[in-house]
Amino acid sequence: MAGRRNLPEHNHRVSEASDHTQPADTVIRPWSSLLIRDYRLIFTAILCGNTSNHMRNVATLYHVYQLSGSSVQLGFTGFFQAAPFIFFGLFGGVLADTLNRKKLIAITHSLSMVPGLLLALLTVSGSIQVWHINVLMVFAGALQVLGGPARQAIIPSLIPQSHLLNAVTLSTLMMQGTQLTAPVIAGFMIDFYGIAASYFVDAFLPLPSVLAALMIRSSGMPQGQRRKIGWHSLIEGVEFIWHTRIILSLFVLDFFAVLFGFYRPILPIFADEIYHVGARGLGMLYASPAIGALIGSGILLAFGDVKRKGALSVIVTLLFALSLGLLGLSQWFWMGLIAVGLLGISDAISVAMRRTVVQILAPDDMRGRATSFLTVFAQTTNATGA
């Protein structure tokens, strides 16, 4: 309950600290947040960091298969990539609410250069083995998880609160874009210059992230009560989520939507047994949600700020359910493409709404933990739904 009592004071403090940078009645355009210097810097840091992570993930999976020729080894490497989210995810939020977020971002990005550099040197020397890749992927994943909540939690302190939805949507759109482009970049690098070159690019991409984080003018310190790193802080975060019913309701809504509606693993069945479109059609089915997600983010950017964010979350969840029903009933390939595209649109809007609501309702010294819970919750729900 303490989190809710502190909320009005926190919101007033945020508006005082940030709204002076832009007039309260400024029209929020799709690119408005990018006009704010500190937001551009954190945007750049996240862009370079995400591109590096996705390039490394693709390159290591390709490399493991080249070294071992084993699908089982690929499964192990995939597990090592995902394991840090499970074991360290929540502690990233504790760090973000305890330490200087700006320095935490810079440190984790600095250290994230190490795995790519070691992978490149081991590859050039010809001594690389699968276990080297797996160990370095755990290290890289842990850094990503421990620094991730700080990258998200610092955003509200860099912009006016009226720009928060715009900023979150831009960040979400950028992250979706890196998921599409980074694997392509890695593939071309491997094909034309070799896998070691891809690792070298991955190693130095976080450098602009470090510089951008250090150039942010905001202090980076969480506002509010100073805490020590420990289990008590983690439990405090659980209590905040439990007592903040709006956030809890959004989590539950998302849980049931994804638990019973995680459709991606069954798309090969639709492509083969229902639509009879083969591998090319399957690729189109997997691409359609990504295109829909870009459209959904574009819709949010066009609208600027949305006042009734909770209501919109419910509406897009209903759209998700209806689109899932359309996919289940569709007997034609074109209808399936439309259905999964609508699923991508509704999911992108829902993700942006949840992130924005969490950022608004969580006090500044609770944002890291709330963000980490949201991330871990989404990851585990997707795994359960699959």
Predicted regions and their residues:
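C-terminal transmembrane bundle of multi-pass solute transporters/carriers
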Residues: 3-4, 16-17, 77, 86-91, ...
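Flexible cytoplasmic inter-helical loops of multi-pass small-molecule transporters
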Residues: 17-23, 214-236
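Helix-loop boundary and gating motifs at the non-cytosolic
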Residues: 23-83, 239-289
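Hydrophobic core of transmembrane alpha-helices in multi-pass small-molecule transporters
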Residues: 47, 128-146, 255, 335-349
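Intracellular juxtamembrane helix-capping segments at the cytosolic ends
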Residues: 60, 146-159, 349-362
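Transmembrane alpha-helix termini and helix-breaking/packing motifs in multi-pass membrane transporters
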Residues: 61-68, 119-125, 181-201, 273-275, ...
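Helix-breaking motifs and short loop linkers at transmembrane-helix boundaries and internal kinks
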Residues: 68, 100, 122-123, 127, ...
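Hydrophobic alpha-helical transmembrane segments
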Residues: 130-141, 163-222, 280, 285-287, ...
